[in-house]
A protein has these predicted regions:
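Periplasmic solute-binding protein
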Residues: 1-5, 95-103
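Sec-exported extracytoplasmic/periplasmic mature domains
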Residues: 37-41, 56, 60, 75, ...
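Solvent-exposed, polar/charged alpha-helical surfaces in well-ordered, non-transmembrane soluble domains
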Residues: 34, 53, 57, 115-122, ...
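Solvent-exposed loop/turn segments at secondary-structure junctions
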Residues: 67-71, 91-94, 107-108, 128
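Ligand-binding pocket segment of bilobal, Venus flytrap-like solute-binding proteins
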Residues: 2-87
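Soluble non-cytosolic domains of exported or imported proteins
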Residues: 26-30, 49, 111-115, 217-225
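Mature extracytoplasmic/periplasmic domains
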Residues: 103-203
């Protein structure tokens, strides 16, 4: 269905992919359970953390991971001379990001708490601290850097091709970094060809990937219970 011509055209003008991704109806959850039960017979495990090590050691050849964990896995595999790649299903995927926000219930009208929360968010959003966090956790920040090119330069430092690299590909990050309209090509990396399907594609997916991705919404308590029961049935029976 997701790859049908009708659905692909509808994606250009509607939120149909978002609706599909966030469908928690009883009927859909039952269908998902049936698929997962069949998949489980050919699956090494249903667990994310151990999957990273299993990819590096060669126990498994395919692993569904969050993009940052994918970057971590590829980095670790490189140390052993193993080159792994990252891909997003052509049917679509979950579009997500890490960020900080102030909870109304946490602030509760307290001016000092609000000031402290704002100070922390301002501090953690500084480009230099954004880079420190990205280096440590392997996940892309929602911060592009504003007037500062520091974060883009960090991406270039991580993934840009060396001067003597023979086969390179342009990797356009203009959609993410500010100022792209005024300075075309300013935010285009020259990366080694294999890198275009590795870490940089996990950190900064191309626009073609974003167009077939949607944000997962917070499920209701009823939906969470329904999905939790489904997972129990899949894993335990």
């Amino acid at each position: 269905k997701l790859l049908s011509e009708e659905f692909q055209k509808a994606m250009e003008t509607t939120h149909c992919l978002t609706d599909e991704l966030n469908d928690t109806s009883e009927q859909t959850v039952t269908k998902v359970q049936t698929i997962l039960e069949k998949m489980r017979k050919n699956s090494y495990s249903l667990e994310t953390d151990s999957g990273k090590a299993d990819m590096v050691t060669g126990k498994v050849v395919l692993n569904m991971q969050w993009s940052g964990d994918g970057v971590y896995t590829m980095d670790e595999a490189e140390k052993d001379g193993l080159e792994l790649s990252y891909a997003v299903p052509e049917e679509g995927s979950n579009l997500w990001f890490d960020g900080f926000c102030m909870m109304k219930n946490g602030i509760s009208g307290d001016a000092k708490k609000k000031q402290a929360a704002q100070a922390f968010i301002n501090y953690i959003s500084r480009p230099d601290n954004v880079i420190r966090n990205m280096y440590y956790v392997g996940y892309t920040s929602v911060i592009a850097g504003g007037d500062s090119d520091l974060i883009f330069k960090y991406a270039d430092w991580c993934y840009g091709a060396e001067e003597d690299e023979e086969e390179v590909s342009p990797y356009d990050l203009s959609y993410f970094f500010s100022g792209a309209k005024e300075t075309p090509n300013k935010y285009v990396l020259e990366v080694p060809k294999p890198q275009a399907s590795r870490q940089v594609s996990a950190q900064y997916p191309e626009q073609s990937v974003l167009k077939r991705s949607a944000v997962m919404q917070c499920f209701s308590e009823e939906a969470n219970r329904r999905i939790s029961r489904m997972w129990i049935r899949v894993r335990c029976f």
